[in-house]
Curated annotation (Swiss-Prot):
Organism: Rhodopseudomonas palustris (strain ATCC BAA-98 / CGA009)
Protein name: Succinyl-diaminopimelate desuccinylase
Domain of life: Bacteria
Keywords, comma-separated and alphabetical: Amino-acid biosynthesis, Cobalt, Diaminopimelate biosynthesis, Hydrolase, Lysine biosynthesis, Metal-binding, Zinc
Active site residues of this protein: 76, 142
Binding site for Zn(2+) 2: 107, 143, 360
Name of the top EC class for this enzyme: hydrolase
Pathway(s) of this molecule: Amino-acid biosynthesis; L-lysine biosynthesis via DAP pathway; LL-2,6-diaminopimelate from (S)-tetrahydrodipicolinate (succinylase route): step 3/3
Length: 387
């Protein structure tokens, strides 16, 4: 039997493509060649949006029946930063002391490589066809604005009649070691700007002005005084975090006319975006009373909260993890947003990949042994899923 490529070799080929978002730099070509060679039907789809870069995406499928398991991910990466600070080139794909270095080694070219390697090995051992369908849904638009990637690729697939039963996103879900965490959900994210209007004037004549600075400080305190909630069965409490306060005033002798404070809320499944906004605005009105003039400008958001309830699918993935690592993974909903939020509208989805400790850092790296373990876990998922 001809041997299939290893996760390490695939990961190195991907890392050597400098696909800093929104550039593809040949990364999807690497995947297309491998998947076509294994019998997948591969589609390359480019999406556009005014004011954003055109993005190349890939959808590949083998099989045409249920059950249908999808592997999803992104080949774009964040910039490497100071190239001279890297021990090994950010796009060299070097291995040293058992570690694979490169931008995207963890987030998330390494995870994609493991999924592809596991799938090719599984197909080679099972007559080249699954007892159902396997697909890969890969975008080059996750690390930036995320408008021409997964969300549109899912819509495109649905219009073609594609139906997914379950999905694994290969994001670096583990905290410290392979097998410690499966992400089964993510909090929603909503940003806004609190704006307080005053009356500009000379500091020597405060009675002729209305200073918005003390008022915005009062409102920030008021909005943070009471928790938004106390958490839920699967989520930690929602959190409102102010991130900047600005008055745009370079002078020391002028009372500003307006003060603005930016904030972000990470919210759990007690809220929708609409009910969350209503709650915050209700508290703002109460804090303003009859004197302070303030309002909130809400920024657009496509980051809704989602959760995949523990059940047969999470048990299946957990069993594959336990077989390789002898660990029982924690089912977790912490962290930031990911493209899984879009996929959750189409099927049950979990995130499981490499260890995320060095993602987005100088010298991003992963142990080669972790690539081997993750490949074995994905292989175990496939065996169980199509049993």
């Amino acid at each position: 039997m001809t041997s299939t490529p290893t996760a390490l070799s695939i990961a190195q080929d991907l890392l050597r493509c400098p696909s800093v978002t929104p550039a593809d730099a040949g990364a999807l070509d690497v995947l297309e060649t491998l998947l076509k060679g294994a019998g997948f039907t591969v589609h390359r789809v480019t999406f556009s949006e005014p004011g954003t870069a055109d993005i190349d995406n890939l959808y590949a499928r083998i099989g045409n029946t249920s059950p249908h398991l999808c592997f999803a991910g992104h080949t774009d990466v964040v910039p490497p930063g100071d190239a001279s600070a890297w021990t090994h080139g950010a796009f060299a794909g070097d291995v040293a002391d058992g570690l694979l270095y490169g931008r995207g080694a963890v987030d998330m070219k390494g995870g994609i490589a493991c999924a592809v390697a596991a799938t090719l090995d599984y197909l080679a051992a099972n007559g080249g066809q699954p007892k159902g369908s396997i697909s890969f849904l890969i975008t080059g638009d996750e690390e930036d604005v995320a408008v021409n990637g997964t969300v549109k690729l899912l819509q495109w697939a649905a219009e073609r009649g594609e139906q997914f039963d379950h999905c694994i996103v290969g994001e670096p879900s583990n905290v410290e070691t392979i097998g410690d965490t499966i992400k089964i959900g993510r909090r929603g994210s909503q940003s806004g700007v609190l704006i307080v209007d005053g009356v500009q004037g000379h500091v020597a004549y405060p009675h002729r002005a209305a200073n918005p600075v003390p008022d915005i400080a009062k409102l920030i305190t008021a909005l943070n005084d009471e928790p938004l909630d106390h958490g839920s069965a699967q989520f930690q409490p929602s959190n409102l975090e102010f991130t900047s306060v600005d008055v745009g005033n370079p002078a020391t002798n002028v009372i500003p006319a307006q003060a603005r404070a930016k904030f972000n809320i990470r919210f759990n499944d007690h809220h929708t975006q609409e009910t969350l906004k209503a709650l915050v605005e209700h508290r703002l009105v109460a804090a303003c009373g009859n004197r302070i003039r303030a309002h909130i400008e809400w920024l657009p958001s496509n980051a809704d909260v989602f959760v995949t309830k523990p059940g047969a699918f999470t048990d299946l993935v957990g069993a594959a993890i336990a077989e390789v690592t002898r660990r029982t993974p924690e089912l977790n909903t912490g962290g930031g947003t990911s493209d899984a939020r879009f996929i959750a509208k189409y099927c049950q989805v979990v995130e499981f990949g490499l260890v995320g400790q060095t993602m987005h850092q100088i010298d991003e790296r992963t142990p080669v042994s972790d690539l081997d373990k993750l490949t074995a876990i994905y292989r175990g998922v496939l065996e169980r899923y199509f049993k």
